[in-house]
Amino acid sequence: MKIRRFFILGLLLVSCGEAQEDFDLLKGALQPNAPRFHPRANTLATLRPIPPRLEVGFPSRDLAGVMLLETERDGVQSWLTADGAAITLDHGMLTSAKGFGSGMSSSDVRQSAALILEGQEGQAKRFHSFLNGNDEIELHAYVCQIANLGAETVLLSGNPVATTKLQENCFGIEDTFTNTYWVQNSAQRVVQSLQWTGNFLGNMFIKLVPDDT
């Protein structure tokens, strides 16, 4: 039976009990021994105004929810779940995913980003670091082919946003994967994407949630 539960940190601001239950169900699937709430997540939940949010999910496991922005500097953002799992985005490109099983420790995606943010096709190399079961870092290299799939409208909080859809097919010695990006035409930013985190959970769905203001 598939699990369809939400780890919605934003709901913690409104209904703590409900959010706790949902957080626990997701955490049980991914991190059975994790604490009920991570102290950093509790701190974020008390901030006003509410920090920026992402809709996220793992289609392969039918899991979905929301992450809150913890830090941002020079286009590099750190996002956090209730139980302390975190991702890093560099101008919308996923560079790390920690706390989700065997996810990426870090990555170099500069060549891919240079093409994708400009809506251009071409070939790029990227490098991912993974922590294996022996607590050793493994470096994986990939050659990626980026294709422009044309114009597509994305709804952000019900509002249509004109984007260019791009697909990135990456090939390495040990694994292959496909990332998909929707880049806002007017701002050259990734507003929605499916990006690979590793073999355990596969692709992560990531979507911006516009500010309420």
Task: Please identify what each model-predicted range represents.
Residues 1-2, 42:
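Poly-acidic low-complexity segments
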Residues 17-88, 92-98, 121-213:
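Acidic, serine/threonine-rich low-complexity disordered tracts
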Residues 12-15:
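C-terminal motif of bacterial Sec signal peptides marking the signal peptidase cleavage site
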Residues 103-132:
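N-terminal trafficking/processing presequences and adjacent post-cleavage segments
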